[in-house]
Amino acid sequence: ADIAASHETALSDLPPMHKPEGAKPRLLVVDDNEDMLQFLKSSFEETYDVVTATNGMEALSLLENHQISAIVSDLMMPKMNGVELCRAVRGNQSFSHIPFILLTAKTDNFSKIEGMNCGADYYVEKPFSTHFLDACLTNLMTRRKQLAQKFSQEPLAPPTALAATP
């Protein structure tokens, strides 16, 4: 398949916002490398409805218009890099809850700390194992589902229920 052609139609081909029961969670993969986008899409398309963006600006557009369950983003990209995207996601109440994984070739401690300080849930270094990335996604999705269940049963939980663990 021609990745450029599939990327051009990605925004218009997405299903509507509501997800029917049993629908796959939608994974947003953001990377300026077309080969990496295709690799991640083919690696995760059995489990997720994978949509792609080539930079942070495209990713924000997808987030504004579609229900996204998790984000995997490269760090170094043009227009808006992964750290800037993560900060924008965490700063927007509409999607600040979405699990966010930075996937990058940058292995220095400064980059790792910057990635975690911007609000990323995981910082995964390239080269990486798709099994490890899948475990990270599964862990984040499970925790999110557990949190949603807890607050659906106790919608008016006291603020102490949200308190950080010491």
Name each model-derived stretch:
Residues 38-42:
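Charged docking surfaces used in two-component/phosphorelay signaling
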Residues 52-70:
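Acidic, metal-coordinating helix/loop segments flanking the phosphotransfer/catalytic sites
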Residues 77:
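Receiver (REC) domain active-site loop signature in two-component systems and cognate sites
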Residues 128-137, 141, 149:
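C-terminal output helix
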Residues 144-166:
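CheY-like receiver
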